[in-house]
From Swiss-Prot:
Protein name per the record: Phosphoribosylformylglycinamidine cyclo-ligase
EC number: 6.3.3.1
Keyword hit for rRNA processing: no
InterPro entries xref list: PurM-like_C_dom, PurM-like_C_sf, PurM-like_N, PurM-like_N_sf, PurM_cligase
Family, per entry: Belongs to the AIR synthase family.
MF GO annotations: ATP binding; phosphoribosylamine-glycine ligase activity; phosphoribosylformylglycinamidine cyclo-ligase activity
Length: 340
C-alpha cells in the first residue's frame, strides 16, 4: 500500500488507470471480428491469420497520429471523434497498399488520467475500428506527469492488415492513360492543422462563417477523417484499381506521385476537384496562395484511384457515392503533378 501511495504522490493515479480500463471494455467489445484471440488486458494482442481465408497473405502495417488537431480537441473540449481520426490515418494508408485492416492498437499519453475524457477518446477509436472492420486488440494508456500538462494528451495508433499477394498495390500497375478518380473527403482530415490553428487562432470556434454554410467553425475543424476501407475493398477484391493514393500531409503535390513510377505524372483538371467550403475559407482568411493549398491540403479529395479506362464504369457502379473524374496519368515531362 505504501508503494502505491508513493507513486500517487509522484502524480501517477493507478486507480484512475484501472478505471479507464474498465470504462473502455464495452467500446473494445464493439470491434470484435473473426480471428481475434485472447482477451483485453493480456500482455500481447493475438490474431489468427488463418481466419482471413487469404491464400498468400502479406501483412501490411501502418502507424500514425493526428498531429495538432489534438490541440483543437482539447481547446474545444470535444474528445469523442479524435480517435476516429487516428484510426483513419492508419487504415487509409494500408488500404492504399491493397490491405484489409485486421486489427488496431492505440497509445494514449497524458499528464493526468481523466477516466471520462479517456473513455471518450477510446470510444472514437472504437468507432473508427468498426468503420474499418478492424479489431481493437490492445493499447497503452500512459500517465506521464511532468511530460504533459494535466489537460494535455497525445494519441497514436498502429494498424495491421492483410493483402492477397497477387493483389498488392505498389504503383507498378499504374500506366499512361489511366484515369484518376477522386473520392470525397469529409473535411480537412488530420493534416495541416498547425497552419489551420494559426489562421483561426483568434476565433472562439462558435463563429458561423459565411463560407461554412451554417456550421460552427469548431464543428467543421473537428469533423472526423473519413475512413475509406469499405469503399475501396470491393474494388481491390475485383482488381479494378491500379493505384491508390491517400491524400494526407503534402496534399496533391506530395501524395499523388507516391501512386506511380518516377517516369509518370498526374494531370489534374482543377475544375473537377470538389473543393470543400472550409478550404475556400482557409485560403481567404489565411491569405494563402491558391497553388499552395494543393501542396498542403486534400482540397476535398481524400482518396485517389488510378483506374484503367475500361474499368471506370464498373468502379462507379460499385461505389455508392459521387466519384470525381479529376485527371489522368501521363508521361512525365517535368513536374510529377500538373494542375490545369
Amino acid at each position: 500500500m505504501s508503494e502505491k501511495n508513493a507513486y500517487a504522490k509522484s502524480g501517477v493515479d493507478v486507480e484512475a488507470g484501472y478505471e479507464v480500463v474498465e470504462r473502455i471494455k464495452k467500446h473494445v467489445a464493439r470491434t470484435e471480428r473473426a480471428g481475434v484471440m485472447g482477451v483485453l488486458g493480456g500482455f500481447g494482442g493475438m490474431f489468427d491469420l488463418s481466419k482471413t481465408g487469404v491464400k498468400e497473405p502479406v501483412l501490411v502495417s501502418g502507424t500514425d497520429g493526428v498531429g495538432t488537431k489534438l490541440m483543437l480537441a482539447i481547446k474545444y473540449d470535444k474528445h469523442d471523434t479524435i480517435g476516429q481520426d487516428c484510426v483513419a490515418m492508419c487504415v487509409n494508408d494500408i488500404i492504399a497498399a491493397g490491405a484489409e485492416p485486421l486489427y488496431f492498437l492505440d497509445y494514449v499519453a497524458t499528464g493526468k488520467n481523466n477516466p471520462v475524457k479517456l473513455e471518450e477518446v477510446v470510444s472514437g477509436v472504437a468507432e473508427g475500428c468498426v468503420q474499418a472492420g478492424a479489431a481493437l486488440i490492445g493499447g497503452e494508456t500512459a500517465e506521464m506527469p511532468g511530460m504533459y500538462g494535466e489537460d494535455d494528451y497525445d494519441l497514436a495508433g498502429f494498424a495491421v492488415g492483410v493483402a492477397e499477394k497477387s493483389q498488392i498495390i505498389d504503383g507498378s500497375k499504374v500506366k499512361e492513360g489511366d484515369i484518376l478518380l477522386g473520392l470525397a473527403s469529409s473535411g480537412i482530415h488530420s493534416n495541416g492543422y498547425s497552419l489551420v490553428r494559426r489562421v483561426f487562432a483568434d476565433y472562439t470556434g462558435k463563429e458561423l462563417l459565411p463560407e461554412l454554410e451554417g456550421k460552427q467553425l469548431k464543428d467543421v475543424l473537428l469533423e472526423p477523417t473519413r475512413i475509406y476501407v469499405k469503399a475501396a475493398l470491393p474494388l481491390i477484391k475485383e482488381e479494378l484499381v491500379n493505384g491508390i493514393g491517400h491524400i494526407t500531409g503534402g496534399g496533391f503535390i506530395e501524395n499523388i506521385p507516391r501512386m506511380f513510377a518516377d517516369d509518370l505524372a498526374a494531370e489534374i483538371d482543377e475544375d473537377k476537384v470538389p473543393v470543400l467550403p472550409i478550404f475556400k475559407a482557409l485560403e481567404k482568411y489565411g491569405d494563402i496562395k491558391h497553388e499552395e493549398m494543393f501542396e498542403i491540403f486534400n482540397m476535398g479529395v481524400g482518396l485517389m484511384l488510378a483506374v484503367s479506362p475500361e474499368n471506370v464504369n464498373r468502379v462507379k457502379e460499385l461505389l455508392d457515392e459521387p466519384v470525381y473524374e479529376i485527371g489522368r496519368i501521363i508521361k512525365k515531362a517535368d513536374d510529377s503533378v500538373v494542375i490545369k
